[in-house]
């Protein structure tokens, strides 16, 4: 029987570790980076809320747009819009009531009929609201997307320019102004996008201001005497790294504050991207596409304009959840195995944190019903795996022994039976569920890793999805419970694909991308157990039928 004082000490150590593990990455930072003004020049304004999307023609109500404009009016002089045809509201009219100026845009794509409708509405709005519309933007990144040839774009610009009194411009990434300088002769303002995160050679936040300065001066030299506006500039608050360009709330605050200071030094005419996180953008751009807002999707400011910034303001709740889950896991284990002591307490602490981390990295990013279902299934699977691991560890530490390991063939057979609604496959499930569920996570990891290899640009590294499986590998290693031998083609295929894809991803990603390097290491850790079973073949009983 373990000494109570040892168990209590282990629980206290686990609690202390939990608090430190959640506080350290969320400690106040960037307090020394000052914001030199409390009001921006302009911000991109898309008033879509969760569940709304221009891709599905689900628009906000006029009342919601009014509320959003009233909110941003406290922080900005102007707003930029991207389409002239939206819902049953006119942004320029509402903006005028709140004293805001508008950079009014028309969306141009491959549909020529729709393009003419956009241009007609743009012209009508600009002429109807000259007190609000201070410039018009004919198309956004049309050349980048290759939606129209440059001659058609120029024709659209000329069409609008002949019909409105405001300055006319076109907006695109700065490289495309270099590639198509002839467009400059048809606009009143050169509107460039500078997004260091999305550059072909991404830049860490500490290197971005020098880049912004250099690009701006290059555009001045290329188009002497022409006014230049920065139509989009910003930094994402979450998502996958690109080399050392790391999305985070702290980095976003640092970028915005330093850019505002630079803009005052150099006299930039600029527009920040963007007012609100746009959940619908994840469909095309992943998590990072939905995370450029200065406000969250539920209209909360992400960071103060001055003073320290906390990466995740909700961290105390997740730390508390980790402690509760750890106590629940240990309590349930102690009830079933009265001899459970300090080692089970430490394992429960690790699993509680893993589950809380999985929730933190999953629930806030469940942007639609499909992601919500995926997150729910994953969290349920990780919760079950954590409970089964506690049971297995307690049995091993008690000297009672655990069920003999199952191989991938048996696990695959169980999954196949369940997909065919053969519920008898779950008879005596406690004896094999841990191995079978672990193998399901292995297959999922292999599939996701292949997707990361062939289509990585918008995919997150799935640390939260495999938090408990990673703890399970570490725990089984310490318990000397990793099986050797008995593996078959399933282990070779799943483990081999995962390992090879992880190595290939690490090679393709830049070494500065520590997030990618860390995930590749985690993927290799997950791949080790099945590959170990290939070292020495042992006969394994066929799965029950």
Regions found by a protein language model. Give the residues of each.
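Aromatic- and acid-rich polysaccharide-binding/catalytic face
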Residues: 98, 104, 134, 172-210, ...
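Aromatic-lined carbohydrate-recognition surfaces of secreted/lumenal glycan-active proteins
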Residues: 106, 160-178, 225-232, 268-278
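Alpha-helical transmembrane segments of integral membrane proteins
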Residues: 340-545
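N-terminal carbohydrate-binding/catalytic regions of secreted carbohydrate-active enzymes
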Residues: 44-106, 110-117
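Active-site clefts of carbohydrate-active enzymes
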Residues: 194-202, 221-252
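Substrate-binding surface in catalytic domains of secreted glycosidases
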Residues: 143-163, 182-222, 240
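Substrate-binding cleft of extracellular glycoside hydrolase catalytic domains
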Residues: 55, 91-167
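Substrate-binding cleft of secreted/luminal carbohydrate-active enzymes
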Residues: 243-306
